[in-house]
């Protein structure tokens, strides 16, 4: 399954647009680690905890996007966009939304 942020795939013409597919992934951030994240952010360092949670959420959202595209018998998802939300800094949560267009290739 090809996942692309572009609307076209070089050398792979699109035969049919099958519709919009979307997914989301919510990752909790360990409350104790979150304290250290805020401490590190205050001093300008990188937060491994937050980066790890974001990476895992993005990977899960991508896998779910692929699964939904497969249900439509798609070969690829184009125009993929990821949005990241942290609905509650106090709650220690990160949400990744992924959307794209499922397509069948020639």
From Swiss-Prot:
InterPro entries: UPF0145_dom_sf, UPF0145_YbjQ-like. Disulfide bonds: none annotated. Gene3D superfamilies: Hypothetical protein apc22750. Chain B. Pfam families: YbjQ_1. PANTHER family: UPF0145 PROTEIN YBJQ. Belongs to the UPF0145 family. This is UPF0145 protein Pput_2816.
């Amino acid at each position: 399954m090809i996942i692309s942020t572009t609307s076209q795939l070089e050398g792979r013409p699109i035969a049919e647009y099958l519709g919009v597919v979307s997914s989301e992934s919510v990752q909790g951030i360990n409350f104790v680690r979150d304290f250290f994240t805020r401490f590190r952010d205050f001093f300008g360092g990188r937060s491994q905890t937050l980066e790890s949670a974001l990476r895992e959420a993005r990977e899960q959202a991508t896998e779910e996007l692929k699964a939904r595209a497969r249900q439509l018998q798609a070969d690829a998802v184009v125009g993929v966009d990821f949005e990241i939300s942290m609905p509650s800094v106090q709650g220690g949560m990160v949400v990744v939304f992924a959307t794209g267009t499922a397509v069948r290739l020639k």
